[in-house]
């Protein structure tokens, strides 16, 4: 996938996820999604170096009877995270 296509896809998924009132009401997840959206508006890929997205979506899932919007699942696959410990 070309970088610009990936950025556009991430933007669309975040926008769609934030349209969901349950997602919007989850403060931690919605703030993180807004950061991801802001990064994509600036034409950059969001790099989740703190690995915040997966735990935020997991907590959302637990709070909503293990139901997660498809947009969040697809977003997890697109957002880059570190694969290993990178040192100090």
Curated annotation (Swiss-Prot):
<protein>
    <recommendedName>
        <fullName>Putative carnobacteriocin-BM1 immunity protein</fullName>
    </recommendedName>
</protein>
<comment type="function">
    <text>Could impart immunity to carnobacteriocin-BM1 to naturally sensitive host strains.</text>
</comment>
<dbReference type="InterPro" id="IPR023130">
    <property type="entry name" value="Ta0600-like_sf"/>
</dbReference>
<dbReference type="GO" id="GO:0030153">
    <property type="term" value="P:bacteriocin immunity"/>
</dbReference>
<keyword id="KW-0079">Bacteriocin immunity</keyword>
